[in-house]
């Protein structure tokens, strides 16, 4: 189901709309430590089971969610307010995720670091593309730990 096929209630809420399920005292954090209050939209690259758990918890805390995953039956995409069905490196899909989201994260470390870098130019992104790039390369990861003094 594309966003255009979802019911109107699944669209990004208008300014000042009530967050789903009332929210919580614990908030997501955007750049410079500014909190993202319930009612904000959290974007996720990846729509697997970890993404689904993230989406459920975010919604329980009062956040809206947007998932980018090419699989039309991705577990997170099925429960998210928005499901952008495209690949991680699709420029239009990344732009749509940035448009819908107030901040973006990734479900797991195997998304292209370049996609996170693209999003980071538009929205707060965590983890950083550079951190994901290190996590994707075991030799680089070991060198990074040595440089940080980790035995």
Residue ranges: model-predicted function:
Residues 1-143:
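ATP-binding N-terminal substructure of ATP-dependent carboxylate-amine bond-forming enzymes
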Residues 146-151:
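Rossmann-like NAD(P)H-binding beta-loop-alpha module
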């Amino acid at each position: 189901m594309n966003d255009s096929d979802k019911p109107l209630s699944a669209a990004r809420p208008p300014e000042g709309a009530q967050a789903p399920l009332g929210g919580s005292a614990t908030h997501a954090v955007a750049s410079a430590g500014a909190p993202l209050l319930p009612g904000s939209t959290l974007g996720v690259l990846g729509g697997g089971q970890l993404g689904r758990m993230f989406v459920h918890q975010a919604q329980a805390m009062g956040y809206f969610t947007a998932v980018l995953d090419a699989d039309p039956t991705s577990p997170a995409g099925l429960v998210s307010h928005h499901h952008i069905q495209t690949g991680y490196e699709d420029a239009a899909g990344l732009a749509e995720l940035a448009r819908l989201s107030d901040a973006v994260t990734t479900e797991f470390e195997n998304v292209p670091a370049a996609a996170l870098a693209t999003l980071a130019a538009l929205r707060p992104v965590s983890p950083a593309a550079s951190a994901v790039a290190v996590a994707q390369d075991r030799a680089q990861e070991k060198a990074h730990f040595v440089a940080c003094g980790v035995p």
